[in-house]
A protein has these predicted regions:
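N-terminal flexible/basic segments that precede or flank functional cores
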Residues: 1-33, 95-100
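Short basic helix-loop element that most often maps to the first helix and adjoining turn
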Residues: 33-50, 77
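Recognition helix of helix-turn-helix/homeodomain-like DNA-binding domains
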Residues: 53-69
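Positions that flank functional sites
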Residues: 54, 93-94
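The DNA-recognition helices of helix-turn-helix-type DNA-binding domains
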Residues: 66-67, 82, 93
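DNA major-groove recognition helix of helix-turn-helix/homeodomain DNA-binding modules
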Residues: 73-89
């Protein structure tokens, strides 16, 4: 884990309220951005993820691009490759969690 990531994790571990705020902000990011962040947290390059997915590296770059609207199946497949899940959460559940 790099210096900033380590420092952020230590802060989030020490301050649960900050961890919740961080999670809420992360959830508001576009899915391609979340995917790119998680790929980097898993220490995978786009090339390494492409190899896992058996696609060319530019396909991963397009999936992660803010200017591209990837298919949900591509997002789900890439998310599983970085050990993540894509969830649909009802607004009322999100509101309940926000007040926790």
């Amino acid at each position: 884990m790099r210096g900033f990531d380590r420092h952020l994790q230590e802060l989030l571990d020490a301050h649960p309220e900050a961890a919740m705020a961080h999670a809420k902000l992360f959830a508001e990011l576009p899915l391609p951005t979340q995917l790119a962040i998680m790929r980097r947290r898993r220490k995978l390059s786009q090339r390494a993820l492409a190899k896992k997915l058996r696609v060319p590296q530019p396909a991963v770059a397009r999936t992660e691009s803010a200017s591209h609207d990837p298919r949900i199946s591509s997002i789900i497949r890439a998310a599983h490759a970085v050990r993540c899940h894509v969830l649909v959460v009802p607004d009322e559940e999100l509101a309940r969690l926000a007040h926790t």
